[in-house]
């Protein structure tokens, strides 16, 4: 008999003793956790789901009949992805959709119940993922390291906690960080062509003439989904991801953690105006430089054509990038006082 436990947007179950192998917990009513509960009701789809609790997240399925060994490995990989985000960003999302205090990732039975292949709250916990029953689980049975991009991408939606300090790059952040997870966890990337295209994009851009703000923001004539180069995909989020992958490979893990720490120190700006988009882009450059403890103008200004004014160049020329306590927010304040 199914046992139901329901409470607003969080659900609490009687926790089983910790063991090496994960087993599904008692059924719970997902209706209060669903992103679009009316759609479930209209389609007359049962909202009972079963949680597979890991150390970091709870993965929900419509049946508890899956192989515990396969599910243990899969949930373990999702745990590692979540931990990777925590390690680098240094800040957890606001707890929203949860089971026993753990962020929920729900395997929905129909993509029309949500917003597509995957859906995630921005800055708060809660992910819905499609295709688990039709393909993902079958692939996991063959190779437990075959984790679809969408899980790590949607975690990036949850972990975008920067607000308008960096909102020009909300989607680009998720695209970039999914590859950080894939590389860090050494899982299988079944779309190598897309990864190769993204890796090459920043080098191709560097050799071209398209300006920085038109390439990396949406406030200078091109929409988010328009390709910036002749190859595809090279839309705005991809270009940011390509640039960040280049910086990460060049500067390393400690740099990336420091980079996000510095992003949090920045002031907020509108992302839909030319001035605001430029200010957010300036913050990107400064945060990257402070994290590197050196001026990255050679990359951002010379190679990527960021429009740094002569006055800004002069001010930054006097900065001791290794100064203790220096952060990107303080530099922005210094530049805006000029």
Give the positions of each predicted feature.
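Beta/coil-rich, acidic/histidine-enriched accessory regions frequently appended to metallopeptidases
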Residues: 23-24, 273-338
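Boundary at the C-terminal end of the N-terminal hydrophobic targeting segment
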Residues: 15-20
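Surface-exposed patches in mature extracellular/periplasmic domains of secreted proteins
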Residues: 87-107, 161-170, 188-194, 255-262, ...
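Sec-dependent N-terminal signal peptides
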Residues: 3-14
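Zinc-dependent metallopeptidase catalytic helix centered on the HExxH motif
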Residues: 134-206
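Long, contiguous juxta-domain segments that are non-catalytic but functionally important
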Residues: 21-47
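Juxtacatalytic substrate-recognition/specificity segment
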Residues: 46-158, 162
């Amino acid at each position: 008999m199914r046992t139901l436990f329901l409470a607003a947007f969080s659900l609490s179950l009687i926790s089983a003793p910790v063991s090496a192998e994960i087993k599904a917990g008692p059924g719970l009513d997902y209706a209060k956790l669903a992103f679009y509960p009316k759609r479930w009701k209209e389609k007359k789809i049962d909202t009972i789901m079963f949680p597979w609790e890991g150390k970091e997240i709870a993965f929900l399925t419509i049946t508890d009949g899956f192989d515990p060994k396969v599910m243990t490995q899969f949930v373990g990989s999702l745990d590692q992805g979540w931990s990777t985000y925590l390690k680098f960003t240094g800040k957890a999302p606001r707890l929203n959709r949860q089971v026993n205090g753990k962020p929920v990732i729900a395997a929905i039975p129909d993509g029309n119940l949500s917003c597509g292949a995957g859906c995630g709250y921005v800055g708060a916990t809660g992910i819905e993922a499609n295709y688990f029953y039709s393909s993902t689980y079958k692939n996991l049975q063959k190779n437990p390291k075959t984790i679809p991009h969408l899980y790590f991408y949607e975690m990036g939606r949850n972990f975008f906690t920067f607000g308008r300090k960096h909102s020009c790059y909300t989607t680009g952040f998720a695209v970039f960080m999914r590859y950080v997870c894939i590389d860090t966890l050494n899982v299988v990337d079944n779309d190598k062509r897309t990864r190769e295209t993204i890796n090459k994009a920043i080098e191709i851009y560097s050799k071209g003439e398209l300006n920085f703000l038109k390439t990396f923001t949406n406030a200078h004539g091109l929409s988010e989904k328009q390709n910036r180069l002749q190859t595809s995909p090279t839309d705005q989020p991809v270009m940011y991801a390509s640039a960040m992958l280049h910086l990460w490979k060049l500067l390393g893990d400690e740099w990336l953690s420091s980079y996000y720490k510095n992003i949090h120190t920045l002031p907020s700006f509108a992302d839909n105006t030319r001035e605001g988009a430029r200010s957010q882009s300036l913050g990107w450059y400064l945060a990257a430089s402070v994290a590197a403890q050196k001026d990255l103008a050679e990359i951002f200004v010379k190679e990527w054509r960021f429009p740094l004014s002569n006055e800004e160049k002069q001010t930054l020329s006097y900065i001791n990038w290794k100064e203790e306590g220096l952060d990107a927010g303080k530099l922005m304040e210094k530049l805006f006082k000029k």
